[in-house]
Amino acid sequence: KRAGYDPRRLDAVFVSHLHVDHFGGLPFLFIEFLHRRPREKPLHIAGPPQTEEKVRQLFLLMYGGSPARELPPVCFHILEPDQRATVEGIQVLPFRVPHQTQEISLGLKVQLAGKQILYSGDSAWSELFIDHARGVDLFLCECSFYDRGTGNHVRYIELLNDLPRLECKKLVLTHLGEEMLARKEELAVTVAEDGMVIEI
């Protein structure tokens, strides 16, 4: 809303994993589509198994009603690791990343109109990113910590060590924690900002 972007222009949303900071905005979109700006075309939502169930549960938790409560026009797609899929004309290769031990967390390599974007999702640093970043136009990589951390998020010093091996055309860091934000001016890599537009 702040950017003046009409959410009806969204064709598809890709969910990397089912932690609420990665899909918690969907109920707000649903309310917008139900009451303020009705959609004619369905919004395609693609994510790991149980995405539809979790999204519906969150919507009911936030706004009430029965399990049969109407959603705006939406179409859910299940993304399985290492199984290519096409969602609303967008080709996607999901792959499992080391973030959770039981539930599935995905990295996503998407292709549209001859351009490729790699998204790490939430993950520890992995050799998978070296492989999948090769030749992509943009690698959007989470980087929660500078040199400390819990082992399930990227640390900047690890990424920096492998920077010469990353053969992507552009690298942008996102999902920064407090330490990373405090040291943002020291970083040798572009950092994502709210409202940022990246041309590829």
Q: For the regions a protein language model found, what residue spans apply to each?
A:
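Cap/insert and terminal regions of metallo-dependent hydrolase folds
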Residues: 124-200
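Glycine- and other small-residue-rich loops at beta-strand/loop junctions that grip anionic moieties
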Residues: 48, 121, 174
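Binuclear metal-dependent hydrolase catalytic cores
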Residues: 1-118, 184-200
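Active-site glycine- and acidic-residue-rich loops that bind
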Residues: 118-124
